[in-house]
Amino acid sequence: GHDEYAGLGIQQISWNRKDYEYVAAVHWSAGHEPLLLVQNRRQTRDQVLSVHLGSEASEGSAPVGSTTVLEEHANDQWLDIIQGTPAFTPDGRLVCALNDMDADTNRLTVDGRPFTPAGWQVREVLDVTDEDVLAVVQRTPELDGYEAPDGLSPWRGDADGHDARSFDVVSFDYDGNVLPMTARPGSWSASRRGEGLVIS
Protein backbone atom coordinates (compact mmCIF):
# COMPACT_ATOMS: atom_id res chain seq x y z
CA GLY A 1 0.00 0.00 0.00
CA HIS A 2 0.87 3.67 0.10
CA ASP A 3 1.84 3.44 3.77
CA GLU A 4 4.88 1.23 3.18
CA TYR A 5 8.04 1.50 1.11
CA ALA A 6 9.87 -1.72 0.17
CA GLY A 7 8.51 -3.47 3.23
CA LEU A 8 9.44 -0.68 5.64
CA GLY A 9 6.73 0.60 7.95
CA ILE A 10 6.08 4.32 8.28
CA GLN A 11 5.84 5.99 11.68
CA GLN A 12 4.11 9.34 11.96
CA ILE A 13 6.12 11.90 13.94
CA SER A 14 4.20 14.31 16.14
CA TRP A 15 5.13 17.91 16.93
CA ASN A 16 3.40 21.29 17.05
CA ARG A 17 2.68 21.50 13.31
CA LYS A 18 0.33 24.43 13.76
CA ASP A 19 3.12 26.74 14.97
CA TYR A 20 6.04 24.98 13.23
CA GLU A 21 4.94 24.06 9.72
CA TYR A 22 8.29 23.41 8.03
CA VAL A 23 10.74 20.56 8.51
CA ALA A 24 14.01 22.37 7.78
CA ALA A 25 16.51 19.60 8.61
CA VAL A 26 16.73 15.98 9.73
CA HIS A 27 19.84 14.41 11.22
CA TRP A 28 20.29 10.89 12.58
CA SER A 29 23.64 9.82 13.95
CA ALA A 30 24.62 6.40 15.27
CA GLY A 31 23.65 5.74 18.87
CA HIS A 32 21.23 8.67 19.16
CA GLU A 33 17.61 9.46 18.46
CA PRO A 34 16.88 11.34 15.22
CA LEU A 35 16.85 15.14 15.34
CA LEU A 36 14.39 17.41 13.55
CA LEU A 37 14.71 21.14 12.99
CA VAL A 38 11.24 22.62 12.50
CA GLN A 39 10.41 26.25 11.67
CA ASN A 40 7.41 28.53 11.63
CA ARG A 41 6.09 29.85 8.32
CA ARG A 42 7.97 33.19 8.62
CA GLN A 43 11.18 31.29 9.48
CA THR A 44 11.72 33.50 12.52
CA ARG A 45 11.33 30.73 15.14
CA ASP A 46 12.54 27.16 15.24
CA GLN A 47 12.68 24.14 17.51
CA VAL A 48 15.23 21.32 17.68
CA LEU A 49 13.36 18.10 18.44
CA SER A 50 14.48 14.59 19.33
CA VAL A 51 12.24 11.80 18.05
CA HIS A 52 11.40 8.97 20.45
CA LEU A 53 12.07 5.58 18.84
CA GLY A 54 11.34 3.09 21.63
CA SER A 55 10.06 -0.18 20.16
CA GLU A 56 7.28 -0.57 22.69
CA ALA A 57 5.75 2.01 24.97
CA SER A 58 6.28 0.90 28.56
CA GLU A 59 4.67 2.61 31.49
CA GLY A 60 6.02 6.14 31.81
CA SER A 61 7.88 6.11 28.48
CA ALA A 62 7.13 8.49 25.64
CA PRO A 63 5.10 7.06 22.74
CA VAL A 64 6.97 6.03 19.60
CA GLY A 65 7.07 8.98 17.18
CA SER A 66 6.60 11.60 19.87
CA THR A 67 9.13 14.42 20.15
CA THR A 68 10.93 16.35 22.86
CA VAL A 69 12.00 19.99 22.42
CA LEU A 70 15.76 20.24 23.04
CA GLU A 71 16.33 23.86 22.00
CA GLU A 72 14.34 26.80 20.64
CA HIS A 73 15.65 29.80 18.69
CA ALA A 74 14.11 33.08 17.53
CA ASN A 75 15.14 36.01 15.35
CA ASP A 76 12.73 38.80 14.39
CA GLN A 77 14.24 38.99 10.90
CA TRP A 78 15.19 35.49 9.74
CA LEU A 79 16.81 32.28 10.99
CA ASP A 80 19.54 30.98 8.70
CA ILE A 81 19.78 27.23 8.26
CA ILE A 82 23.31 25.86 8.52
CA GLN A 83 23.56 22.55 6.70
CA GLY A 84 24.77 19.75 8.99
CA THR A 85 22.97 21.09 12.06
CA PRO A 86 21.51 20.15 14.42
CA ALA A 87 23.71 17.16 15.28
CA PHE A 88 24.80 15.14 18.28
CA THR A 89 28.42 14.55 19.17
CA PRO A 90 29.14 10.83 19.65
CA ASP A 91 29.06 11.38 23.45
CA GLY A 92 25.63 13.05 23.24
CA ARG A 93 26.19 16.81 23.28
CA LEU A 94 23.96 18.86 20.98
CA VAL A 95 25.55 21.06 18.29
CA CYS A 96 23.22 23.73 16.87
CA ALA A 97 23.33 26.83 14.69
CA LEU A 98 23.11 30.26 16.29
CA ASN A 99 22.27 33.46 14.41
CA ASP A 100 24.17 35.72 16.81
CA MET A 101 22.80 39.18 16.03
CA ASP A 102 25.02 40.91 18.62
CA ALA A 103 28.15 39.54 16.93
CA ASP A 104 26.62 39.67 13.41
CA THR A 105 27.83 36.08 12.98
CA ASN A 106 26.39 32.66 12.17
CA ARG A 107 27.95 30.60 14.96
CA LEU A 108 27.72 27.13 16.47
CA THR A 109 26.71 26.16 19.99
CA VAL A 110 27.30 23.01 22.00
CA ASP A 111 24.55 22.36 24.56
CA GLY A 112 23.48 25.99 24.13
CA ARG A 113 26.94 27.56 24.62
CA PRO A 114 28.49 29.40 21.62
CA PHE A 115 31.96 28.05 20.87
CA THR A 116 32.85 29.39 17.42
CA PRO A 117 34.42 32.87 17.36
CA ALA A 118 32.66 36.04 16.28
CA GLY A 119 33.46 36.99 12.69
CA TRP A 120 33.74 33.36 11.52
CA GLN A 121 30.55 32.78 9.52
CA VAL A 122 29.75 29.05 9.66
CA ARG A 123 28.18 28.03 6.33
CA GLU A 124 28.13 24.23 6.64
CA VAL A 125 28.99 21.58 9.22
CA LEU A 126 30.87 18.69 7.60
CA ASP A 127 31.62 16.43 10.59
CA VAL A 128 31.04 16.37 14.35
CA THR A 129 33.24 14.47 16.81
CA ASP A 130 33.72 14.58 20.58
CA GLU A 131 36.77 16.81 20.07
CA ASP A 132 35.79 19.18 17.27
CA VAL A 133 33.52 20.27 14.45
CA LEU A 134 34.77 20.37 10.86
CA ALA A 135 33.06 23.24 9.04
CA VAL A 136 33.07 25.48 6.00
CA VAL A 137 33.40 29.14 7.01
CA GLN A 138 33.64 32.63 5.56
CA ARG A 139 35.67 35.01 7.67
CA THR A 140 34.52 38.61 8.23
CA PRO A 141 37.85 40.32 9.08
CA GLU A 142 36.29 43.49 10.51
CA LEU A 143 34.34 41.38 13.05
CA ASP A 144 37.08 38.86 13.74
CA GLY A 145 38.38 39.24 17.26
CA TYR A 146 39.84 35.73 17.36
CA GLU A 147 43.31 35.34 18.84
CA ALA A 148 45.05 32.01 18.45
CA PRO A 149 46.56 30.51 21.62
CA ASP A 150 50.06 31.04 20.18
CA GLY A 151 49.22 34.64 19.24
CA LEU A 152 49.58 33.92 15.52
CA SER A 153 46.96 34.32 12.83
CA PRO A 154 45.46 30.98 11.74
CA TRP A 155 46.75 31.67 8.22
CA ARG A 156 49.93 33.49 9.20
CA GLY A 157 50.78 36.05 6.49
CA ASP A 158 47.90 35.06 4.17
CA ALA A 159 44.99 35.96 6.48
CA ASP A 160 43.77 38.90 4.36
CA GLY A 161 42.85 36.55 1.50
CA HIS A 162 40.67 34.43 3.79
CA ASP A 163 37.69 36.78 3.91
CA ALA A 164 34.03 36.67 2.88
CA ARG A 165 35.05 35.64 -0.66
CA SER A 166 36.80 32.49 0.57
CA PHE A 167 34.95 29.35 1.71
CA ASP A 168 37.54 27.73 3.97
CA VAL A 169 37.50 24.41 5.82
CA VAL A 170 38.45 24.69 9.48
CA SER A 171 38.27 22.63 12.64
CA PHE A 172 36.73 24.29 15.71
CA ASP A 173 37.32 22.67 19.08
CA TYR A 174 34.72 23.24 21.78
CA ASP A 175 36.93 25.87 23.45
CA GLY A 176 36.69 27.98 20.26
CA ASN A 177 40.18 27.31 18.91
CA VAL A 178 40.49 27.35 15.12
CA LEU A 179 42.66 25.01 13.07
CA PRO A 180 42.61 25.76 9.30
CA MET A 181 42.45 22.72 7.03
CA THR A 182 42.89 24.74 3.81
CA ALA A 183 45.97 26.88 3.25
CA ARG A 184 44.96 28.99 0.24
CA PRO A 185 41.83 31.10 -0.18
CA GLY A 186 39.20 29.46 -2.37
CA SER A 187 35.89 27.62 -2.38
CA TRP A 188 36.61 24.45 -0.42
CA SER A 189 34.81 21.47 1.05
CA ALA A 190 36.01 18.28 2.74
CA SER A 191 35.07 14.79 3.81
CA ARG A 192 36.47 13.20 6.96
CA ARG A 193 36.35 9.64 8.23
CA GLY A 194 38.40 8.64 11.27
CA GLU A 195 41.92 9.96 10.75
CA GLY A 196 41.43 10.52 7.00
CA LEU A 197 40.55 13.89 5.47
CA VAL A 198 39.92 14.63 1.79
CA ILE A 199 39.88 18.32 0.77
CA SER A 200 38.17 19.28 -2.48
Stretches with model-predicted labels:
Residues 1-200:
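Peripheral, non-catalytic segments that deliver or gate enzyme domains
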